[in-house]
Amino acid sequence: MNENEYISRLKARDIRPTALRLLILRTMAGFDRAFSLADLEEELDTVDKSTLFRTLTLFLAHHLVHGIDD
């Protein structure tokens, strides 16, 4: 998927595309299996954990991703 497709996905869900949101979405799309928050934290070790959590919460609220409570 190219950058414009990621931007379109965010805009389609009324999410403003920022560099960090695009980075997180690209990283999520790169997984070939289900992944956890810990997996994302490991992959995105330069991103603050609270920022990552807030972004995932935003994605969940706008139905860009779905979550599973464990």
Where in the sequence are the language-model features?
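Basic amphipathic alpha-helical segments that dock to polyanions
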Residues: L52-H63
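Short, Lys/Arg-rich nucleic-acid/phosphate-binding segment
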Residues: D69-D70
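Short alpha-helical segments that sit at the start of domains
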Residues: M1-L25
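Short coil turns linking two alpha-helices in DNA-binding domains
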Residues: V47-D48
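Short acidic, hydrophobic short linear motifs in intrinsically disordered regions
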Residues: A34-E43
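Short helix-capping/hinge SLiMs at alpha-helix to coil transitions
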Residues: I15, A29-D32
